[in-house]
From Swiss-Prot:
The keyword Transmembrane does not apply. Residues 59-315 form a coiled coil. It is found in: Lysosome membrane. Residues 8-96 form the RH1 domain. It comes from the Eukaryota. Residues 356-368 have a biased composition (Low complexity). InterPro entries: DZIP_RILPL, RH1, RH2. Interacts with Arl8 (in GTP-bound form). It comes from Drosophila melanogaster (Fruit fly). One of its GO terms (biological process) is lysosome localization. Belongs to the RILPL family. GO terms for cellular component: ciliary basal body; cytoplasm; lysosomal membrane; perinuclear region of cytoplasm. The gene is Rilpl. This is RILP-like protein homolog.
């Protein structure tokens, strides 16, 4: 068994308290029952009479604890699976959050760098614009001082203006390129957002699958519990079947003994019949003739008694008393003569048959069954089935197991008498179920 093992001394040792179940408890109870049978066969029932109720209470308590242990182990396993699932979800979310933060940091860094470039470009353009404005003002002031230099100054102004226009065009192209980059990055951000939404939807789908798996796991555990309950029921039925097999074997042994006795009696009767045919003193009268003679004798005795009573009434009291005494003595003598005559004609077997027939002819006493009528049924009533609906009780499976194991046998095949096993069965079931709860509360 998974919860126990035998050491070198032959003692049963507990392996792991977390692995013990109800089936292990019933196996242990079966082993204890076998040990009790060996002890009772060797030392008798008195050696275990005080220990049996304590052992039964202990096994009931162990059965309750094993059932509670199975429920707690199932609950702990469910909680562990839930914790593992939550931890895996937490790690997945943390990894996804870390990647998302990293991508956001990269995008934000790129945006900062581009923004700084644009700010530097704008500041440089503003400086160039200020320089051009100042240069234009200087040219206008110098044009008032020297008019002769107007043509050359005009050409220089035109060339400078063309140069500024060319630089402005180049700056515009740069700005246009930057705008295009900004639009491109915006599109990329939108694409990343769509990918993020897809990841979220995929995560939701995985969560739904996880819920389905959890539901299937709960269903599997429920089926496992049902299977455990069926195994427990099968163990109890197995114990019932073993007890029934033991009862049947005892009944078979008893029937075999009765058959042997009947065969022996039959042989004795056949032998006595053969001896009676050769016996010269065998009965000369049939049963019917002997019955008629006895009935006729009884009628005559009754008539004599009636006539003596009538005669006593007609005579004086003193003569009636003496006559009555003489009548009693004469009747006794007549009875002795009749008995002697019967003894001379019949043997001892005829006398026994005559006495039996006389007893049959006598009127029945008060409370006795008259001849020709069936006698009332006597003896123990048949046993009621254990699965009768009116016999449902709240006793534990351990008590039922020991009730079947130590049931009162109906034969004498065992080494100890019937009453001892019956006493042991009652002793094993003497402890009330409340004692188990009391002992559990004490622990």
């Amino acid at each position: 068994m998974p919860g126990f093992h035998l050491n070198e001394m032959g003692e049963m040792v507990l392996d792991a308290i977390d692995d013990i179940g109800v089936v292990d408890v019933y196996d242990l109870a079966s082993d204890i029952g076998k040990e009790y049978e060996r002890i009772m066969d060797r030392f008798g029932t008195d050696a275990v009479s005080g220990l049996m109720p304590k052992i039964i209470n202990t096994l009931e308590l162990l059965e309750a604890l094993a059932t509670k242990n199975e429920r707690e182990n199932a609950t702990i396993q469910e909680l562990r699976d839930k914790v593992a699932q939550l931890e895996s979800e937490k790690l997945e979310k943390a990894e996804f959050r870390r990647r998302f933060d990293k991508e956001l940091e990269l995008i934000e860094e790129q945006w900062r760098s581009e923004t700084n470039e644009l700010v530097d470009l704008v500041s440089s353009l503003q400086d160039e614009n200020k320089r051009l404005v100042k240069q234009t003002q200087d040219l206008q002031s110098s044009s008032a001082q020297s008019s002769g230099l107007g043509a050359s100054l005009t050409e220089s102004i035109i060339s400078m203006t063309n140069h500024e226009l060319h630089s402005a065009l180049s700056d515009t192209q740069v700005l246009q390129r930057l705008k295009e980059q900004i639009y491109k990055q915006r599109d990329e951000l939108k694409h990343r957002e769509r990918e993020l939404q897809d990841k979220y939807s995929e995560l939701e789908h995985l969560n739904i699958q996880a819920e389905r798996l959890k539901a299937s796991e709960r269903d599997t555990r429920r089926r496992h519990k049902l299977m455990q309950a069926q195994v427990k029921t099968l163990c109890e039925e197995r114990a019932d079947f073993l007890a029934q097999l033991q009862d049947q074997s005892r009944e078979i042994n008893q029937l075999r003994k009765r058959l042997g006795l009947a065969e022996k009696e039959n042989e004795d009767l056949v032998a006595s019949y053969d001896d009676g045919q050769n016996d010269p003193n065998r009965p000369r009268y049939t049963t019917r003739e002997l019955k008629e003679l006895i009935s006729e004798r009884d009628e005559l005795l009754t008539t004599i008694d009636t006539l003596n009573e009538q005669l006593a009434e007609l005579k004086p009291p003193s003569q009636a008393k003496g006559k009555r005494q003489r009548h009693f003595s004469s009747s006794d003598d007549s009875d002795e003569d009749d008995d002697g005559h019967v003894a001379d004609n019949d043997d001892d077997d005829d006398e026994e048959e005559a006495a039996a027939e006389a007893n049959e002819l006598e009127p029945p006493a008060a409370g006795e069954t008259p001849p020709g009528h069936d006698a009332p049924v006597q003896g123990p009533l048949p046993y009621e089935p254990d699965d009768a609906p009116w016999k449902k009780s709240s006793e534990s499976g351990i008590r039922k197991f020991f009730r079947k194991l130590f049931s009162d046998p109906s034969d004498g095949s065992n080494t100890f008498p019937k009453r001892s096993l019956a006493t042991l069965s009652k002793m094993a079931l003497s402890a009330t179920p409340g004692s188990v709860s009391a002992s559990a509360a004490a622990k």
